[in-house]
């Protein structure tokens, strides 16, 4: 494909309100962005791709009982970027993949099922001798509902199938690098030798810019799955439930545990050293029922998943909670907040907290996890869940009565936390003036009695700490004080429609006429109230998800 992009843009002036007003009470404004005239930029992108694919498929039923299937395929792909930098030799080299795959299936009376798949995939991203990887997969199923004793004892069961599978999948996209087994050598990055008494004579030299990884191989994901499929009461109830486990071995990542004697302190090599596992449950269920002229359909689905780090070449640490091994991928980490300091006496009696400013009453108090009397990075611990939801679910309802139709969809997440921060929650942290979150300033904040006139505002359990101007290293640190649940349940979609009778529409040569109303993102239930918890930045500066209302008229002739 080829893509030509022409951008024309100009910037208008941006002014910022200052801290003080003039003698007449008017805001003092300062220009922070100058106006720029219209300018034009052109960008060209594109690539060339070649595909070749050939396959052979064979299926046959023997003796009315043995169903056999055989499939084979060869696939080749080449992709060349056409807009690489003229000096980029690697960028000019095509990306090539070659794969052979096959499948064998067998079923006996559609009761006992077996399948074997294999793939032999080659990638030019690996050195000679390691370019191809073999990735097998096998699965088996037992449709127990096809047994005569089940049909006799439990006739209300339409289908009940037990299944299990195991397979391996390879990945050759390693950190986005081309030919990562090759070391890149050049004369850039200050590579030189110094000569002379004071080292003033410097001679250009070659330098390893990127260290290659010998014996690099495919990342391998081993996937396990056990599940059931079911259908009861002539299809009124149906669904599936699965338990899954994905174990990823030989993950391509940077080595972190290498002695300084190797001379690689500032550039440790990449290697197949990482291991992770993801496991969880997923399922869906549907219910269909007719009550008189009303037809109902209820459906629900969920996915629950956890991803743990098994190994990432870390150095041993006596503070076990400082390691990534054994914790979730992208685990949230921070200090444990113990409320707010009540007075100076409490500050003096507590473990020492360091900051870019003196610790004052109303500042956040932290737990000394390792007991050394000082609050520092050694007291940062894993906290809560990660930002990516561990639980996702949805519930839908459909109903129709005569010519009326109703559809409702709920969607939600759980098992996820996030830190709030930035210029919104930490008001005035950048020594700037402008929009701030009103809830952060006017809410339940710790306020000195000298300002409020009452000791009631010196509350160690207040929602917000002492308000300060400029950055506050103590209060702005990630901690349980700023950690919130990100779970929510949203009424994602509601649709109501009416189908006009065809006996009436045909008079106007219309076969179908539907009038409908659609509402999206109408309601949200969440413990976090300050802004929309779905997909927002830590400071809430994302544009919120809109509620939308629309009507439509659908006509078919």
Please state what every model-predicted region is.
Residues 22, 413-509, 513-514:
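Extracytoplasmic gating/loop element in the C-terminal half of outer-membrane beta-barrel translocons
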Residues 210-212, 379-383, 390-395:
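Glycine-rich, charged/polar anion/phosphate-binding loops
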Residues 1-10, 28-330, 474, 478-557:
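Extracellular/periplasmic, surface-exposed regions of secreted and cell-surface proteins
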């Amino acid at each position: 494909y080829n893509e030509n992009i022409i951008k024309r843009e100009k910037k208008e002036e941006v002014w910022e309100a200052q801290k003080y007003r003039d003698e007449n009470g008017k805001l003092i404004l300062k220009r922070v962005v100058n106006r720029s005239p219209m300018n034009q930029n052109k960008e060209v992108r594109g690539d060339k791709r070649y595909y070749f694919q050939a396959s052979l498929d064979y299926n046959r039923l023997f003796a009315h009982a043995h169903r056999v299937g055989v499939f084979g395929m060869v696939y080749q792909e080449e992709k060349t970027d056409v807009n690489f930098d003229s000096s980029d030799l690697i960028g000019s080299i095509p990306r090539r993949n070659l794969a052979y795959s096959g499948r064998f299936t067998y079923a006996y009376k559609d009761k006992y099922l077996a399948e074997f798949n294999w793939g032999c995939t080659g990638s030019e991203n690996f050195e000679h001798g390691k370019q191809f990887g073999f990735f097998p997969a096998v699965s088996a199923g037992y449709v127990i509902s096809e047994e005569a004793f089940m049909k006799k004892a439990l006739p209300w069961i339409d289908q009940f199938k037990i299944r299990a599978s195991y397979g391996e999948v390879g990945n050759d996209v390693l950190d986005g690098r081309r030919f990562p087994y090759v070391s890149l050598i050049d004369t850039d990055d200050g590579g030189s030798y110094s000569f002379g008494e004071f080292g003033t004579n410097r001679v250009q030299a070659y330098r390893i810019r990127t260290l290659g990884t010998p014996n690099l191989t495919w990342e391998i994901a081993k996937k396990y799955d056990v599940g059931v499929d079911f259908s009861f009461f002539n299809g009124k109830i149906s669904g599936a439930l699965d338990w899954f486990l994905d174990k990823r071995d030989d993950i391509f990542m940077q080595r972190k545990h290498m002695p300084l004697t190797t001379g690689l302190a500032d550039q440790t090599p990449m290697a197949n050293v990482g291991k992770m596992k993801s496991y969880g449950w997923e399922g869906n269920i549907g219910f269909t029922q007719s009550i008189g002229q009303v037809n109902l359909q209820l459906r629900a689905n969920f996915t629950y998943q956890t991803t743990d780090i098994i190994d990432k070449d870390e150095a041993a640490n006596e503070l076990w909670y400082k390691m990534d091994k054994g914790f979730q991928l992208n685990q949230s980490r921070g200090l444990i907040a113990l409320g707010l300091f009540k007075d100076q006496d409490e500050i003096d009696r507590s473990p020492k907290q360091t900051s870019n400013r003196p610790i004052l009453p109303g500042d956040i108090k932290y737990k000394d996890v390792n007991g050394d009397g000082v609050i520092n990075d050694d007291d940062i611990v894993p906290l809560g869940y990660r930002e990516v939801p561990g639980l996702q679910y949805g519930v839908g309802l459909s109903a129709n009565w005569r010519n009326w139709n109703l559809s409702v969809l709920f969607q939600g997440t759980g098992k996820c936390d996030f830190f709030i921060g930035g210029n919104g929650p930490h008001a005035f942290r950048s020594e700037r003036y402008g929009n701030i979150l009103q809830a952060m300033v006017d809410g339940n904040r710790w306020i000195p009695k000298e300002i409020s006139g009452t000791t009631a505002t010196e509350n160690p359990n207040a929602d917000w700490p002492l308000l300060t101007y400029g950055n506050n290293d103590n209060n702005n640190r990630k901690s349980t004080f700023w950690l919130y649940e990100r779970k929510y349940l949203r009424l994602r979609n509601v649709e109501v429609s009416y189908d006009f009778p065809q006996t009436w529409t045909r008079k106007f040569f219309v076969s179908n006429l539907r009038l409908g109303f659609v509402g999206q993102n109408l309601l949200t239930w969440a413990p976090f109230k300050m802004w929309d918890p779905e997909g927002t930045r830590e400071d809430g500066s994302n544009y919120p998800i809109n509620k939308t209302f629309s009507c439509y008229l659908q006509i078919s002739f």
